[in-house]
Curated annotation (Swiss-Prot):
This is Large ribosomal subunit protein uL29. It comes from the Archaea. Belongs to the universal ribosomal protein uL29 family. GO terms for cellular component: cytosolic large ribosomal subunit. The lineage of its organism: Archaea, Methanobacteriati, Methanobacteriota, Stenosarchaea group, Halobacteria. PROSITE patterns: RIBOSOMAL_L29 (PS00579). NCBIfam families: L29. SUPFAM superfamilies: Ribosomal protein L29 (L29p). InterPro entries: Ribosomal_protein_uL29, Ribosomal_uL29, Ribosomal_uL29_CS, Ribosomal_uL29_sf. Disulfide bonds: none annotated. Part of the 50S ribosomal subunit. Interacts with protein L23. CDD domains: Ribosomal_L29_HIP (cd00427). Signal peptide: none annotated. Gene3D superfamilies: 1.10.287.310.
């Protein structure tokens, strides 16, 4: 999985953004589980990259009004 750039995220539909967000959250959860278990992650910088990508998607969702009120 590559880094998501802002323009790529803006070009996605709201449903695609939501699906990508779910995928990134799952990947982050797995990476943190490996780290918590004491294992060496394949790419140590990946956790930071995932967090930033999630933040970018959420920011754009907020700007474009995609966010639901309960989030």
């Amino acid at each position: 999985m590559t880094v998501l750039h802002v323009q790529e995220i803006r070009d996605m539909t709201p449903a695609e953004r939501e699906a990508e967000l779910d995928d990134l959250k799952t990947e982050l959860l797995n990476a943190r589980a490996v780290q918590a278990a004491g294992g060496a992650p394949e790419n140590p910088g990946r956790i930071k990259e995932l967090r930033k990508a999630i933040a970018r998607i959420k920011t754009i969702q907020g700007e474009e009004g995609d966010l639901q009120e309960n989030e």
